[in-house]
């Protein structure tokens, strides 16, 4: 197990805040969020201008399909596709506003892992609870980043300036979008397609639990070590359960929230 080194003496609140602010770095640049956003725009342009038919998007080798779960890359690559420009713009806006600050402090590797695991958690969770749907969209990764902000505050609360405002801002964005997703799921459809709130929830759960494990902790205490183990155990148990579930219940098993056609998330 890799141990994270910590300072021998605890920081005072003023020093801790300065220390955390000093962690923001543009060198190396936060390339993961930028590269991911550019890739998503390029994929949207390709499927909009080159192959504009929605049937082509549904037949894309990148989309998550329950009948193609043996093609494991689909659990990740569906996050590069979007059903419309509003869907794309919202996801990119949130992941840039939320992801870049995290990447500047914690580095591209940690944030890249969090984002991709959020995407995977979105499709794995959907495969269990909404087992008969197709998926496009990066909201699993976006919600992993939102929840990672909560993990970041829990880890470094005493070292931050205005941590409560950070939580309020993240909670506002998450609850607003999540409320729309749940409403849309039961009452309407965006772009003629239903929104999968399961992928939002499972992406957020992955971001919170894994974020508490891999994000940098500048204020380590005994209770943080206990929280670290609880988070690691929860994350591992959820991932193992969904993988085993998929192995034991191949398509066309119908999950708790049955649906059809394509969902955006």
Per-region residue spans from a language model:
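C-terminal transmembrane module of polytopic alpha-helical membrane proteins
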Residues: 1-31, 41, 165, 170-265
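N-terminal TM1-TM2 helical hairpin plus the immediately adjacent luminal interfacial "cap"
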Residues: 16-138, 185-195
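Hydrophobic membrane-targeting alpha-helices
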Residues: 45, 101, 124, 128, ...
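Charged, low-complexity, helix/coiled-coil-prone segments
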Residues: 85, 90, 146-150, 254
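Alpha-helical transmembrane bundle and helix-membrane interface signal
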Residues: 104-109, 149-169, 215-226
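Cytoplasmic-side transmembrane-helix entry/capping segments in multi-pass membrane proteins
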Residues: 112-117, 138-142, 163-171
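Specific transmembrane alpha-helix
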Residues: 121-124, 133-156, 201-213
């Amino acid at each position: 197990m890799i141990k994270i080194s910590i300072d021998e003496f605890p920081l005072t609140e003023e020093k801790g805040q300065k220390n955390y602010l000093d962690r923001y770095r543009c060198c190396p640049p936060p390339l993961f969020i930028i590269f991911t956003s550019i890739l998503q725009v390029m994929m949207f342009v390709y499927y909009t201008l080159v192959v504009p038919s929605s049937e082509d998007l549904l037949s894309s080798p990148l989309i998550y399909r329950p009948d193609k779960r043996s093609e494991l890359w689909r659990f990740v690559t569906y996050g590069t596709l979007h059903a419309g420009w509003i869907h794309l713009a919202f996801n990119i806006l949130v992941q840039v506003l939320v992801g870049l600050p995290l990447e500047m402090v914690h580095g591209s590797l940690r944030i890249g892992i969090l984002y991709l695991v959020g995407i995977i958690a979105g499709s794995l969770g959907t495969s269990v609870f909404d087992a008969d749907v197709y998926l496009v969209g990066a909201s699993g990764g976006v919600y992993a980043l939102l929840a990672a902000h909560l993990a970041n505050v829990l880890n470094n609360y005493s070292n931050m300036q205005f941590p409560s405002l950070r939580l309020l801002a993240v909670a506002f964005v998450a609850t607003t979008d999540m409320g729309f997703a749940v409403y849309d799921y039961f009452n309407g459809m965006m772009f003629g397609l239903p929104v999968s709130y399961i992928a939002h929830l499972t992406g957020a759960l992955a971001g919170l639990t894994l974020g508490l494990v891999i994000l940098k902790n500048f204020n380590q205490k005994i209770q943080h070590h206990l929280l670290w183990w609880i988070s690691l155990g929860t994350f591992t148990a959820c991932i193992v359960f969904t993988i085993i579930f998929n192995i034991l219940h191949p398509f066309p098993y119908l999950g708790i929230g049955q649906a059809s056609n394509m969902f955006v998330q």
